[in-house]
Amino acid sequence: NCIVLDFFSGSSSTADAIMQLNADDSGHRKFVMIQLPEECEKKSDAYKEGYKNICEVGKERIRRAGNKIKSEHPNADIDVGFKVFRAADTNIKWNSLMDMGQIDINQMETSPDTIDFVPGAKDVDIVYELMLRQNDVPLSSKIEQIFGGGYERTYLYADSYLVCLETKITNELIDKLAELDPLPIKFIFRDSAFQDDIALKDETFRRLKAL
């Protein structure tokens, strides 16, 4: 059940070995591979096959290792999935007041995300960034979109953390959140979604805290 960390992981041979070892002894070891996206030499076989940097080579090796294990152990319950993260700037405007001078008022009304997030930010990236700041949440956990019917931007992470990126908080949404069972251990809202409705914000905190 250990976690193996490999800096400068190259083609991810460590990940390959760990996956094979798990398959052999039914272990549950996990791995974290860290590698700069160094470009492959243009004369190399990897480059000729379409892999422009060593990270792409590593990802393909992990995929092939997983496929090989699945073919060799067709009836085994083995997790061969993996996630890929890249170092990047923040997706969130943590100090919106500093950016207000750069925001068009009409744009604020038609695109509320302009207030809170950088252009092009995706919900999944925002959720992961928020979870990174929780310190004790593994990034291997699943993200689940829990509602529909007009509330497509509310997510449950690791079955414990609720991240609500809806542009407007409503009483109907709060009712839905209060009905969740089991209840998340933490709720994360965007302040702008309350649209300066202090009474609604107080009611939201009161109801969810009381639960």
Residue ranges and their predicted role:
Residues 2-21, 131:
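A phosphate-binding catalytic loop at a beta-strand-loop-alpha-helix junction
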Residues 1, 21-211:
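Accessory, often C-terminal, charged low-complexity segments
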